């Protein structure tokens, strides 16, 4: 079953972000390694002191942005799915509360435990597993950068119940082992997870274990597909390139914890003579056009899953977390 503890804490992180308990980790092969400054040498992505500074720098910028409802204040510290989801949230917040979020309580992250993979080439990354002042879950951040001159940016932010944090495979020096995008030793290659999830949501199957974000989501869509005067259609697709590439770390059982990103659309179409009413201020803030007959909403979602080793018992991928956020809306 999917494990989805931790939702309440992350709902505080984003008013219209959908969240659950999440996990740690990441990775993917870098392409085009250049033989300069040791890019072909296998090295830790960062020293612990560097990781600590990166966490502090992100937290300072993040709290400023949340307080002011201004995405420009942490734009240099976020990327990938987090930039998409949280950036849209801040954009909506700025329109609904241009003076800022007066009720915002600064996020505090303590007891940081870093999972730092050793690899050659760029991009590089590491994971920070932290305690927060929001709840009892572990808040997990994935830091990435594309070169030695870049600032560390957070591409994933999610939460995981302490008991759900997986054990990572490490070498004798304590460095984690990254998995590649095309790792054939896993039940599903990381680069295929986004497409596999999109296919599953449309057609079902046995690629993913039952749970809230798999069988539960399909059941909910089926129930809401057609109601008196209103029909809903869904489209799902992977996001695999650049800062949205899947990332994973090997676990001690030979599987991996993998993060991946997907893109989702929901279109609501009203019957003739029926009006579409939009009450959510965040949807209104991000919406273009007038929803006279239809409303199309666009979401970005990042998932954290356990991808089992190929041939090791149950081959279904298990969800640990899903964080989704509205990024755009269009009325027609």
Curated annotation (Swiss-Prot):
Assigned GO CC terms: plasma membrane
Key words of the record: Cell membrane, Lipoprotein, Membrane, Palmitate, Signal
Record's subcellular location: Cell membrane
PROSITE patterns documented for this protein: PROKAR_LIPOPROTEIN
Secretion signal span: 1-32
Domain of life: Bacteria
The keyword Phosphoprotein appears for this protein: no
Annotated lipid attachment (S-diacylglycerol cysteine): 33
Lipid group attachment sites (N-palmitoyl cysteine): 33
Membrane-topology annotation of the record: Lipid-anchor
Name of protein: Uncharacterized lipoprotein SAV_5923
Record organism: Streptomyces avermitilis (strain ATCC 31267 / DSM 46492 / JCM 5070 / NBRC 14893 / NCIMB 12804 / NRRL 8165 / MA-4680)
Lineage: Bacteria, Bacillati, Actinomycetota, Actinomycetes, Kitasatosporales
């Amino acid at each position: 079953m999917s494990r989805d503890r931790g939702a309440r804490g992350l709902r505080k992180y984003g008013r219209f972000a959908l969240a659950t308990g999440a996990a740690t980790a990441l990775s993917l092969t870098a392409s085009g390694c250049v033989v300069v400054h040791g890019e072909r040498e296998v090295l830790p992505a960062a020293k612990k002191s560097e990781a600590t500074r990166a966490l502090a720098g992100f937290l300072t910028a993040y709290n400023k942005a949340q307080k002011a409802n201004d995405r420009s204040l942490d734009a240099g510290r976020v990327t990938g799915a987090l930039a998409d989801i949280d950036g849209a949230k801040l954009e909506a917040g700025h329109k609904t509360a241009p003076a800022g979020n007066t009720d915002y309580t600064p996020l505090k992250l303590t007891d940081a435990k870093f999972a730092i993979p050793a690899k050659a080439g760029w991009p590089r990354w590491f994971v920070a597993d932290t305690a927060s002042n929001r709840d009892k879950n572990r808040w997990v951040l994935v830091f990435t950068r594309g070169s030695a001159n870049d600032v560390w940016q957070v591409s994933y932010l999610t939460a995981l119940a302490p008991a759900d944090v997986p054990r990572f495979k490490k070498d004798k020096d304590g460095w984690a082992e990254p998995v590649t995008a095309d790792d054939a030793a896993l039940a599903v290659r990381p680069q295929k997870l986004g497409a596999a999830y999109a296919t599953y949501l449309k057609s079902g199957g046995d690629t993913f274990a039952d749970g809230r974000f798999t069988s539960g989501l399909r059941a909910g869509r089926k129930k809401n597909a057609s109601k008196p005067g209103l029909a809903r259609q869904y489209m799902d697709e992977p996001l695999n390139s650049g800062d949205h590439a899947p990332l994973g770390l090997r676990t001690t059982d030979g599987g991996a914890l993998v993060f991946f990103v997907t893109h989702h659309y929901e279109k609501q179409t009203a019957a003739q003579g029926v009006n579409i009413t939009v009450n959510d201020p965040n949807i209104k803030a991000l919406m273009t056009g007038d929803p006279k007959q239809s409303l199309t909403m666009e979401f970005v979602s990042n998932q954290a899953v356990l991808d089992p080793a190929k041939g090791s018992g149950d081959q279904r991928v298990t969800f640990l977390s899903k964080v989704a956020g509205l990024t755009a809306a269009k009325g027609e």
